[in-house]
């Protein structure tokens, strides 16, 4: 115990540098030599002699030789014997300096479980545990410092993130996820812009505004807008007209009676069933042109088809009246579609059962009840049958099928004259 050491100088009466006296019963204290890199002692301490017998209870002596810059662990006592209770103090004795007390501690029943360092007035605790919690007092002269310390247990995950560098794993994962999401958003935006650009380019391209239709053999010649229409035949003109109107999304209002439309459709179906199927496929490929250049391919040449149209119209003529004048054949005026008198009756026509397997689908003997011949007008590139009006004499056979016709208000009233001569049927647009 160095605190019990008294005068360590070896005088002539206490001893010499050669060693202890032979009569001494106590071991001598050791000398501490500090060596530098040149393997020479930095200083030569004087020999330390044992204190008087009465001043020591027990003396343990050790000889230590260390190199310059080494770390020393000086143990007070021989392991594993530890002081469990009582005061502990360390005092440094230098031959050329006065004695200095390094550390004074009073140990309790439970020794501290962590390392403690004293650096001047500072107490250093390394690897603090829960047992280190409590109140610490520091006495320095007349000043007393009281410190209350509370130790909180840190979660294992948080400890792993901070002490083991585990925070790098979630940080890198988060950065990678943000990068992937950003790349995906940029890719979708670029793809959307490219799709819109292709659509805009396709819509503005004049070569792609119309369908490329391959013409059937013998039905027309190809062009950039589709097929050039051939002249209508007697059996397919009406069906083709109706299909053109359906393909263009328009609705052609029929100004003739129902018998004429039904008989024409029946006659077309019975005479040329294969032609109607071909024309139906052909009609679906047409599209209405936006310019006048495209519409000229759909024009009807009235001069070339005049003979054929005359044949079609021959079955619709009324034998009682003569042919219309040249003024009536030129064109249709708007007056033909207006109702001059809402009270006048609409002409009545008699239908024929065209679905019956017996008999003809067209009865020429009853043509007196139908309206006049058809004339063909060209409107927006579409050919349709424009009926001409003929006088109609009501008879007793008209009342038999009165429920099958429209606008049977007053069939017996007189009809106004057409163009100053003959009779004119009044049409209702209702």
UniProtKB/Swiss-Prot annotation:
Post-translation changes: Phosphorylated on tyrosine following B-cell activation. Phosphorylated on tyrosine residues by LYN. Tyrosine residues are phosphorylated sequentially after activation of the B cell receptor. Phosphorylation of Tyr-405 is extremely rapid.
Disulfide bonds: 10-49
Domain Ig-like C2-type intervals: 1-17, 52-152
Biased composition (Acidic residues): 278-299, 327-344, 401-415
Annotated glycan sites: 1, 14, 28, 59, 142
Domain of life (superkingdom): Eukaryota
Record function comment: Functions as a coreceptor for the B-cell antigen receptor complex (BCR) on B-lymphocytes. Decreases the threshold for activation of downstream signaling pathways and for triggering B-cell responses to antigens. Activates signaling pathways that lead to the activation of phosphatidylinositol 3-kinase and the mobilization of intracellular Ca(2+) stores. Is not required for early steps during B cell differentiation in the blood marrow. Required for normal differentiation of B-1 cells. Required for normal B cell differentiation and proliferation in response to antigen challenges.
Xref: PANTHER family: B-LYMPHOCYTE ANTIGEN CD19 (PTHR16674:SF2)
Name of the protein described by the UniProt record: B-lymphocyte antigen CD19
Gene name for this UniProt entry: CD19
């Amino acid at each position: 115990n160095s605190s019990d050491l008294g005068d360590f100088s070896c005088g002539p009466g206490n001893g010499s540098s050669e060693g202890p006296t032979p009569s001494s019963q106590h071991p001598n204290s050791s000398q501490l030599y500090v060596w530098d890199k040149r393997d020479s002692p930095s200083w030569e301490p004087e020999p330390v002699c044992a204190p008087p017998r009465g001043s020591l209870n027990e003396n343990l002596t050790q000889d230590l030789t260390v190199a310059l810059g080494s770390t020393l662990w000086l143990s007070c006592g021989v392991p594993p014997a530890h002081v469990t209770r009582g005061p502990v103090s360390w005092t440094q004795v230098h031959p050329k300096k006065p004695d200095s007390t390094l550390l004074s501690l009073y140990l309790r029943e439970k020794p501290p479980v962590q390392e403690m360092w004293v650096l001047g007035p500072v107490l250093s605790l390394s690897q603090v545990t829960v047992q280190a919690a409590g109140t610490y007092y520091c006495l320095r002269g007349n000043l007393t410092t009281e410190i209350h310390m509370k130790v909180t247990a840190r979660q294992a995950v948080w400890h792993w993130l901070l002490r083991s560098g585990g925070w790098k794993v979630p940080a890198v994962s988060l950065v990678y996820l943000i990068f992937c999401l950003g790349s995906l958003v940029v890719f979708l935006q670029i793809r959307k812009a490219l799709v819109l650009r292709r659509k805009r380019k396709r819509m503005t391209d004049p070569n792609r505004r119309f369908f490329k239709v391959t013409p059937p053999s013998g039905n027309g010649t190809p062009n950039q807008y589709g097929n050039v229409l051939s002249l209508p035949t007697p059996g397919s003109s009406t069906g083709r007209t109706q299909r053109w109107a359906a393909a263009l999304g328009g609705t052609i209002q029929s100004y003739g009676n129902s018998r004429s439309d039904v008989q024409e459709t029946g006659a077309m179906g019975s005479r040329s069933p294969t032609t109607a199927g071909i024309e139906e496929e052909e009609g679906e490929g047409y599209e209405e042109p936006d310019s006048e250049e495209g519409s000229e391919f759909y024009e009807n040449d009235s001069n070339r088809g005049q003979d054929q149209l005359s044949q079609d119209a021959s079955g619709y003529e009324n034998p009682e009246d003569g042919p219309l004048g040249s003024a009536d054949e030129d064109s249709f005026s708007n007056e033909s579609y207006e109702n001059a008198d809402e009270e006048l009756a609409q002409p009545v026509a008699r239908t024929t059962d065209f679905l019956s397997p017996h008999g003809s689908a067209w009865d020429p003997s009853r043509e007196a009840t139908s309206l006049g011949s058809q004339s063909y007008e060209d409107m927006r590139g579409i050919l349709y049958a424009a009926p001409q009006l003929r006088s109609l004499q009501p008879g007793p056979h008209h009342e038999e099928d009165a429920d099958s016709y429209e606008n049977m208000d007053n069939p017996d009233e007189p009809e106004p004259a057409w163009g100053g001569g003959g009779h004119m049927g009044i049409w209702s647009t209702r």
